[in-house]
Amino acid sequence: MSTKDFNISRDEFRNITRCLDNEEFRNLFMEYCTELRDNRKQYEDELSMLEAQRGYDVKFLKPSPGYVIKTIVDGKGKGFINVCQSELVQKPTSTTGLNEDGTKGLKWSVPYAQTQPRKDYDNKRVECTVYDVMFHPDALHLASKNEGFRKLLNDTSLDAVEQSFKVRLDRANLRFPKLQYKGTPSSSVVREKLPHCDSLPKDELFDKLLPPLPNVPAPGKTGSERTTKTKNKENINRTAAVAAAAASPGNPFYTTPEYKIVQCRDVEYGEMTNELDAKIDVTIPRELKVVITLPLLKSTAECALDVTKTTLHLVSEKPARYKLELKLPYEVKESEGKATFNVEARSLTVTLPVLRKRNITLQDINSANVSASPAKEAGKLIEEIGTIIPPAGGDQQLARAASAPSAPEVPKKTIFPKFSVNKMENLLAFTLNVRNVDPSTIQLDNRTDSVHCRFSNVGNGYFPCFYVFFVRFPNALVTDVQHEEWDNNLIIQITLNTASVSSYQAGPDEHETVEYSIMEDIADKINKFGKEIEDDSLCIAVVRQATKASAKVKADALMSIEITKREEHGEPECDEKDGSEAEKARTLQKAKRNSRKKKKERSLSDSFCDHLKVIVENEASTEVAGEGATIQSSAKPIDSPEAKARKARSISECCPPKESDGGEEASTMPTLTRKYKSILKRSSYDRSISECSSVDDLGTSVEMARSIGEECRKTVRFNNSIRKQLFRSNSCILTMKKKALKRREVKRRADARRMSEGESTDNDEKDAHHHDDEHCSSSDQHDEKDAIEDDSGVSFDSESGDKEIAAAMKAEAIGGGGRGKAASKRKNSNKQGGAKSNGGKKQGTDAKNIQFKSDMIFDIEI
């Protein structure tokens, strides 16, 4: 309306102004506005007229403030009960009577009226539920004067809410805030049937529009009276029961809080397989979570929580009275539990890990069967006992049987484990090589001179395997036995009364044992490196043992490692029997080694090396025997009738001998060079003297070198040049391949052209060399150097490459006139291509020749 233009004439404006000046008009206008704003009264009048046409008298109950009760609804949310008053509710009445115990008292009948619950919010903007219970003003007046009547009024209000709306209220933790009314008051309707309602005409239209009427009560009693009496009776009974429970001192009134138990379990990948033990204990949770809702507590400082294996107890006195006694579905570890309190949700969470029981194994079943068999025998009520005549000496036999220790029963299928033993003074440690040993199944039977052990483990197929181990010491007594479980083995430590134990017996039981001896001393104190053992307190010996029946050492005897500790002062004498057995074992091993050597096929080089070694030994012996022998005695030719003549490299002539070297040093060099080994063969060969030193003045026979090494010669070359293949990241591989092929073709053509030019220029260079005076005037020292380089292939002058390039250029210049026209044309075409490119090609060619000369050549004598 504000968006439209408001058109008013001058006369209309003058009339409105004149009317507003009149006070009577203003009052009428205000009354009209009030009716438009609040039409509750009009609604009530119209509804009363409508119900009167149907035969009912309608009254509207408007609650007046009284006081408020605060409690908890269903253990979750807050609830407020408005105990208010209304004139339309009947007055409370009382009659005299007797209680159950015979005492006189008053029986009160307190009528009340209720409205439907509505949702509201508290000070923290948390949603809550509000209920209205209306009494007569006289009832509230009596409650303000009498504390007992006030309590009766509170119990009546709580009972009315619980019965009408099917909720559970917390009676133990009631609060009375300083409020007269919670929320906004709302009126309710009280409908009563008129006496002459049957004579009124019925209108079907009203019956369809309005809700159905309640059932007609029985004649003689009105509905209000019957309902009031029933409620009063229930209220009195409930009030008496509550008062009796509160009055009993031994059972104080507590509220049981809301709780829930959550079973938690981790899902593992192993449970998704088809293994036999994949689904074991799947239904048993890992932990239990008990969530307790405590809406009236801000903290758990005043709470007392007690947890056992099977129960949970919670008690709270202030600020709210809570008590919870809970029986847990599984046994828990009470010492490992933890509790947390959520302030926002007002809940206490108690986490308790579940105590898992050990799984039943096959051994438990066997033991149960064994224990059940004597129980069956004992179950017989009557047994026939015959007359038994004891033989002579029966008492002694019974005494022996009683004194002898009874061996524990062993399962039928057992395994004797592999073991090793370590000895230190009087302590023996037996290591049983068994994996995954179950510690709960280890049983040790400690006897006077023996130890019997039984245990089991879980095999690869998750099936238990049973092991037995029995050890006896004939000449010693067992004082203490201990065991240690590891992932890979089981260690049994046995302490004896003496350290002088030479042997022991071991086996699956006392009837099937094998004797094992312990080596107490090591005769040789020299280790494999040729050094004396400084601390020989711990000596390790490997001995092959034999059985009792055979005295000889067998090839399949058991192998054991014994560690013994020696005394610092004095060495104990070795047992003769042990020494003989060790000597026999060494002899047997040596015989086997020799037989393997005989069966091995030897090459010709191996056999010839043996002859060379014999020659070296003979030469060494002759030098020691006679100091005045000449050098020619070691230079005799080698004649080998059994072996063929083998080729070896002669002494190198690449380096001249030094005059300063003495004859003694030269005489010892042939002997020293025989200890070098070849890099091409596994067998040891005599290597020739280094190529860098000369042996012209040595006394070694040339005939020996020729007879051994001039027939076979092997050369090893090591080239310093490295071939590289480079690929660019921003180019195609196929393009680079084509370029490489093209460069390779150009290089091949250049090499072919260079080779053809070299053949034609060889003769010209020779003629130019004969006619050139400058080249003939070169020094003798330079000729010797060139000769050495040509012979060995190694250039000793760093500028030799440059000199060769200059000589080649001069030879080409001199022989240019004697060449044919074809040679001159090729030369001119090369010059036209550019001096820079020709120089590069020539330099590359000479560089290749220099690189070839710098290669290293090694000659190896065989």
Swiss-Prot record:
Belongs to the PIH1 family. Kintoun subfamily. It is found in: Cytoplasm. It holds the Pfam family PIH1. Residues 208-229, 564-602, 626-670, 743-854 are annotated as: Disordered. Required for cytoplasmic pre-assembly of axonemal dyneins, thereby playing a central role in motility in cilia and flagella. Involved in pre-assembly of dynein arm complexes in the cytoplasm before intraflagellar transport loads them for the ciliary compartment. Residues 587-601 have a biased composition (Basic residues). Transmembrane segments: none annotated. Its main location: cytoplasm. The lineage of its organism: Eukaryota, Metazoa, Ecdysozoa, Arthropoda, Hexapoda. InterPro entries: Kintoun (IPR034727), PIH1/Kintoun_subfamily (IPR050734), PIH1_N (IPR012981), PIH1D1/2/3_CS-like (IPR041442). It comes from Anopheles gambiae (African malaria mosquito). It comes from the Eukaryota. PANTHER family: PIH1 DOMAIN-CONTAINING PROTEIN 1, PROTEIN KINTOUN. GO terms for biological process: axonemal dynein complex assembly; cilium-dependent cell motility. This is Protein kintoun. Coiled coil: none annotated. GO terms for cellular component: cytoplasm. Keywords: Cytoplasm.
